[in-house]
Structure formats: C-alpha cells, structure tokens
Regions:
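Short alpha-helix plus adjacent loop in nuclease-associated cores
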Residues: 29-50
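Acidic/histidine-rich catalytic cores and adjacent linkers
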Residues: 2-19, 23, 27-31, 50-183
Length: 183
C-alpha cells in the first residue's frame, strides 16, 4: 500500500490490510525535507534588502541548493551580472552556505538524507533520521519526528519499487482537463 504521510490513510491501510507492506511515496519523503530547506532560504533572503548582493544570489541560484552535491561543477563558468567572485557552481554554493549557519547545516542534512535515500543505504538513512536535531528550527525537528514515526514505511520505500506517481499524474491531468474545460 503506497501513501503519503497522511496518518488517517496509514491507519486505515494497516487495519484493512494487516498483511500489506505500507510504503511512503518517495516523492513525499524527499519533499518534506526539501520544503524545510526552501523555507530557510526564503527566511534568510528576507533578512536582506531586495537589491543586496546576497539576496540576488540566493534568489538566482536557489536550484543549486537542491542539486546533488556530487553533481556540482567545479569547472569555470561565466556568470551573468558580472559576479566576478564566482568561477564555478561550487563557488556560488560556498557563498550561499556562508551567508547563514543554519542554512548550511540544513543543506548538509538534506544532502546526507538524499544521498542515503538515493543509494538505498538503509543504515545510513537510519543514522540521518535518528540524529539529534534539537538545535534546528521547529519545522526541521517536526520533519524528523515524522521521519522517526514512519521510519519503517520509509525503509519500505527503499526496499520496494512501488510508487503512486502514475496515479498522481493521472489525477493531475484529470484536474487540468476539468479546469481548462470549464469556460
């Protein structure tokens, strides 16, 4: 049974299908932590004025935070707006992470989590989930409490290939057709 983190679905599934393996959809697992990283980036951006250099860098290169660290380029690249201090994606990322300490910490937790998840490293994932996150914001703490609560189902997402992505895609197309077809 594949579901998101909605506890009612999980309770119903465990009661109606006692022998079923419950799996949290991989998209929802990754999204929960990536939303925390995105919100922290926005929070840091709001501490600067719109025309300050850090604000512009955080706004323009936000996708670097979500890119796998192993895929960050260290090769020379020309950047727009004469950002002469940057010579590669790695330089930009280092600058972004130097702006705020908690943003950097959340970034590395995100990278550890995604790496363990993508490599299907169950022990590594358990280690990341069970770390102490008391020094982080409430939203990050809540995220990892949720991960701890549903750890078995998250591990099942690694073990089994099932996903509800196809069903979600069909539902999205149906909603789009209904919206476009009206009027």
């Amino acid at each position: 049974f594949v579901s998101d983190f909605y506890s009612t679905y999980l309770d119903v599934a465990s009661n109606l299908f006692p022998n079923a393996k419950i799996i949290i959809d991989r998209f929802h697992i990754k999204r929960l932590l990536s939303v925390n990283l995105k919100n922290k980036r926005i929070e840091v951006m709001k501490t600067f004025k719109k025309y300050n250099f850090p604000y512009k860098v955080l706004k323009r290169y936000k996708k670097l935070l979500f890119k796998n660290f192993n895929e960050i380029s260290i090769e020379y690249k020309a950047f727009k707006y004469n950002y002469n201090k940057f010579h590669s994606e790695y330089d930009v990322l280092n600058y972004i992470l130097s702006i705020d300490e908690e943003l950097e910490e959340i970034y590395w937790v995100y990278q550890d989590f995604i790496e363990a998840f993508d490599k299907k490293d169950i022990e590594g994932l358990r280690e990341v989930i069970n770390r102490d996150y008391s020094m982080f914001s409430i939203s990050v703490q809540t995220t990892f409490e949720t991960y701890k609560k549903y750890e078995e189902y998250i591990i099942n997402a690694i073990k089994y290939i099932y996903s509800n992505g196809i069903v979600d895609g069909i539902n999205t197309k149906i909603k789009l057709l209904k919206r476009v077809g009206y009027g």
